[in-house]
UniProtKB/Swiss-Prot annotation:
Belongs to the SAICAR synthetase family. PROSITE patterns: SAICAR_SYNTHETASE_1. Gene3D superfamilies: ATP-grasp fold, B domain (3.30.470.20), Phosphorylase Kinase, domain 1 (3.30.200.20). InterPro entries: SAICAR_synt/ADE2_N (IPR028923), SAICAR_synt_PurC (IPR033934), SAICAR_synth (IPR001636), SAICAR_synthetase (IPR050089), SAICAR_synthetase_CS (IPR018236). GO terms for molecular function: ATP binding; phosphoribosylaminoimidazolesuccinocarboxamide synthase activity. It comes from Saccharolobus solfataricus (strain ATCC 35092 / DSM 1617 / JCM 11322 / P2) (Sulfolobus solfataricus). It catalyses: 5-amino-1-(5-phospho-D-ribosyl)imidazole-4-carboxylate + L-aspartate + ATP = (2S)-2-[5-amino-1-(5-phospho-beta-D-ribosyl)imidazole-4-carboxamido]succinate + ADP + phosphate + 2 H(+). Keywords: ATP-binding, Ligase, Nucleotide-binding, Purine biosynthesis. This is Phosphoribosylaminoimidazole-succinocarboxamide synthase.
Length: 233
């Protein structure tokens, strides 16, 4: 069956599939700095597709709806056709990344309660931080929808944090994207080491921060492989 490409981003391609579904193909591209840094990491697409599928199934088993339907092949998902919202939603358990640059918060500081932040998906503007007023003015979502997403993020965090902890890792933070399916808000995109920060008890990095910090591609790939192996064993 010939499929038509709908769109292509930095790390994934969306293809038409049927009336209610699309295909999401994971590429081997790895990027950082709003796409300013880019390489090809052979096998990364498969690793991220498999990791994402695993976590989507985990969330579904815990009553949290995602766009995941199944796998077409090892790097391509069949997913529900959502109207995606161009907002990245980040939940932080432990301080690292941009928040320690923006605010007087120390690296590694543990938050008493998780912090949820919204960012506009806009590489040219470097994904600016959004509040409820911005999102309403830009017609991205209303306050009630944003608060509902915050509730979903907290539920997702409960599931992911405890599961990941059981495998010997610590979930510092993660990013999700949402889309509309009728009047529902549903988790879309991916849940992989490109979109979460994972450490072990010795503060060893397993996620895309390795690439951001200049580690070689072999180290990045071996960490992605080890993480997937451990969570699925």
């Amino acid at each position: 069956m010939e499929v038509n490409k709908i769109s292509e981003g930095k790390t994934k391609i969306v293809y038409d599939f049927d009336k209610d579904h699309v295909l999401l193909e994971f590429k081997d591209d790895i990027t950082a700095g709003d796409g300013q840094k880019r390489d090809i990491l052979e096998g990364k697409g498969v690793l991220n597709a498999q990791t994402s599928a695993f976590f989507f199934r985990l969330l579904e088993r815990n009553g949290i709806e995602t766009h995941y339907v199944g796998m077409k092949d090892e790097r391509t998902m069949i997913v529900k056709k959502l109207k995606m919202i161009p907002v990245e939603v980040v939940l932080r358990n432990i301080a690292t990344g941009s928040i320690v640059k923006r605010l007087p918060i120390k690296e590694g500081e543990v938050f008493e309660s998780p912090i949820v932040e919204f960012f506009l998906k806009d590489d040219l503007r470097h994904d600016p931080l959004l509040n409820y007023y911005h999102m309403e003015h830009l017609k991205l979502m209303n306050r009630k929808e944003a608060q509902h997403i915050e509730d979903i993020m907290m539920k997702v965090n409960d599931v992911l944090f405890n599961f990941i902890k059981s495998k010997g890792f610590i979930l510092y933070d993660f990013k999700l994207e949402f889309g509309r399916l009728g009047d529902k808000l549903v988790i879309g995109d991916e849940i992989s080491l490109d979109s979460m920060r994972i450490r072990d008890g010795n503060s060893r990095i397993y996620d895309k921060d390795l690439y951001r910090k200049g580690y070689d591609l072999k180290t990045v790939k071996s960490s992605y492989e080890e993480f997937l192996k451990r969570i699925t064993s």
